Amino acid sequence: MITGFQIIEEGIFQKITDELDKIGLHYRLFSRSKDEKSILEKIDRKESEGNPYEKDKHLIQDIIGIRVVTYFRDDVELVKQILPRILSFKDEEIDSPELTVFSPKRTNIICNFTDDQIKIFNEVKSTSSKSYFDLLDTTFELQLRTMLSEG
């Protein structure tokens, strides 16, 4: 585990928990931060797929992942409306439902770190000799799902 990433992860987790608890929503929250092995595997996989990460161009955006799981589809939309109050959304990918196929709808959002989180990230980076830090973005992935899509 990379301690600085865990500190950032825990802060994001708590911030989301505090905001969602204010509205009395029923949900579950999961989080993880990538360890060195996982980061290196992802870098290798993307390179073998012909889509390598590049410094200052194509960066890993999910060193931290947060998943909010709600009981109802409408609650996913509610969470998506509420969280921009406390998080900075950068990009999103939302599945378009097919009327003839039963499948979960994925909502994945890339969020920017706060200034304080960037400071922690940069402190970890400055004390590390690992070159992969140049391939890491100061963002995290937020996934919104329903219980049904969790299987």
Segments (PLM) and residue ranges:
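Nucleic-acid processing machinery
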Residues: 1-151
